[in-house]
């Protein structure tokens, strides 16, 4: 992909419109040790950022007051027993991330991937793609719900034994809570159905009670990637990574708040996504739009959330941009949607290769939206991103490790931006994710996927 440098140090995708919103923190001249631009006065003591790490099967917990790693939540089963087959490090040798899940007697998570907060921010659901299950996380106490005391606990073993979570089906990609928090919808990307769980029962079941947490399976399009709900919680949109379609369901909640889904329509989105590979979607804060990330089409699109769900905008992102998640930021200085781009570009800050985020101005008339600017994420293969409730901070997760010769060489990092001016983001810092310290050795946190900013007790983005 050809890059073009412009005044102000910003670098934009060839063929995209240039605007004069180039920030000194965005371009090739921007340093890694740039002073923080955000006072962080909006951050509260209870705020935390959670990141799923797919290769290490861990969740990183970041304290946004200090932008440092507070803890790592363990979804592996290593070191529950002192005997060699149960250990992470055996005879002084640590396995590779790819090999560790094949060790004998491993019963932990495989491919920790999706993560989403409950409407009140007190609960997280995360999916194990390879282990075909869902785990529930207490977001207040930062612990896995359902773990039990380890009968083999001791100086060289873990104090807890990992729960099995809830087995739901093949390739659970993304879990999503209904707006009332009563249910969890899990898209089974390896199948053609959605698992719908009762949240209260699920909390009991992960602790070992046979609570029949799975209420039903709903047939849908092949390869469902993610479900998301309109603002009222009455309509669900389901995207696919195997077909150029979007399923739209009426939730039909009963008096108890539980759903009885009925398909309204299956939309043909081949004009926007001919390859049929749409991994993520999200509704706008005003509830009027739903935005889709078409990864292999290198585009995002927007549809109305009511009526006949008409297409409102299709926004190309450039050759091989490979968009992942979208996120909305709206405050006194602007109204945008960001799209994280997996592609890694040369010529990033300090000359180091970096991914970028596309900025789309949502304040303009529908049908005219386009990329107005991009900014470097200061790390490689951007994936999950989430803003804080005040919409003045943005956290970005990355899949690839940092390159040799860089300040955080060999580490997976999260990066932080001041987005108090959404059209002019300012880089704040890198956060190296470090390691999970197991009794037998350190397991490095690796390959970050989803990221969520959580304020327990606050009605968040899923409310």
Language-model features: where?
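Short, conserved, GDST-rich strand-edge loop motifs in beta-rich repeat architectures
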Residues: 36-43, 340-353, 397-413
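Short loop/turn segments immediately following the C-termini of beta-strands
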Residues: 54, 129, 189, 241, ...
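Beta-propeller fold detector
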Residues: 70-86, 145-152, 156-160, 206-219, ...
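Beta-rich, blade/repeat-based domains predominating
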Residues: 28-45, 78-119, 151-179, 219-232, ...
């Amino acid at each position: 992909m050809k890059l073009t440098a412009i005044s102000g140090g910003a670098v934009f995708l060839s063929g995209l419109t240039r605007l004069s919103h180039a920030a000194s923190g965005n371009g090739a001249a921007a340093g890694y040790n740039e002073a923080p631009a955000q006072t962080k006065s909006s951050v509260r003591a209870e705020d935390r950022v959670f990141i799923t790490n797919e290769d290490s099967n861990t969740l990183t917990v970041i304290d946004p007051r200090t932008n440092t790693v507070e803890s790592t939540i363990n979804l592996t089963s290593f070191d529950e027993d002192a005997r060699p087959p149960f250990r992470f490090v055996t005879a002084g040798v640590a396995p590779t991330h790819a090999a560790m899940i094949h060790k004998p007697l491993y019963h932990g998570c495989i491919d920790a991937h999706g993560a989403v907060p409950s409407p009140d921010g007190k609960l997280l659901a995360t999916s194990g793609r390879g282990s075909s299950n869902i785990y529930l996380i207490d977001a207040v106490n930062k612990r896995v719900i359902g773990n039990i005391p380890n009968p083999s606990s001791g100086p060289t073993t873990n104090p807890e034994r990992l729960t099995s979570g809830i087995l739901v089906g093949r390739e659970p990609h993304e879990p999503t809570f209904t707006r009332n928090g009563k249910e969890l919808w899990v898209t089974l990307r390896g199948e053609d159905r959605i698992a719908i769980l009762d949240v209260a029962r699920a909390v009991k079941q992960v602790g070992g009670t046979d609570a029949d947490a799975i209420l039903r399976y709903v047939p849908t399009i092949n390869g469902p990637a993610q479900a998301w709900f309109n603002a009222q919680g009455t309509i669900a949109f389901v995207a696919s990574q195997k077909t150029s379609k979007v399923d739209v369901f009426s939730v039909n909640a009963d008096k108890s708040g539980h759903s009885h889904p009925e398909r309204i329509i299956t939309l043909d989105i081949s004009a926007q996504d001919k390859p049929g590979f749409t991994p993520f979607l999200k509704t706008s804060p005003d509830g009027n739009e739903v935005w889709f990330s078409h990864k292999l089409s290198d585009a995002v699109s927007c549809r109305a959330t009511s009526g006949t769900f008409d297409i409102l905008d299709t926004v190309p992102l450039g050759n091989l941009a490979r968009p992942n998640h979208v996120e909305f930021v709206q405050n006194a200085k602007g109204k945008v949607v960001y799209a994280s781009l997996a592609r890694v570009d040369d010529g990033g800050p300090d000359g180091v290769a970096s991914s970028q985020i596309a900025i789309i101005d949502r304040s303009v008339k529908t049908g005219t939206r386009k990329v107005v600017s991009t900014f470097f994420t200061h790390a490689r293969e951007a994936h999950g991103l989430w803003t804080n409730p005040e919409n003045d901070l943005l956290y970005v997760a990355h899949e690839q490790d940092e390159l040799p010769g860089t300040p955080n060489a060999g580490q997976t990092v999260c990066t932080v931006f001041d987005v108090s001016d959404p059209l002019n983001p300012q880089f704040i810092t890198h956060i190296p994710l470090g390691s999970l310290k197991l009794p037998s050795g350190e397991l490095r946190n690796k390959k970050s996927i989803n990221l969520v900013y959580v304020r327990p007790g606050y009605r968040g983005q899923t409310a």
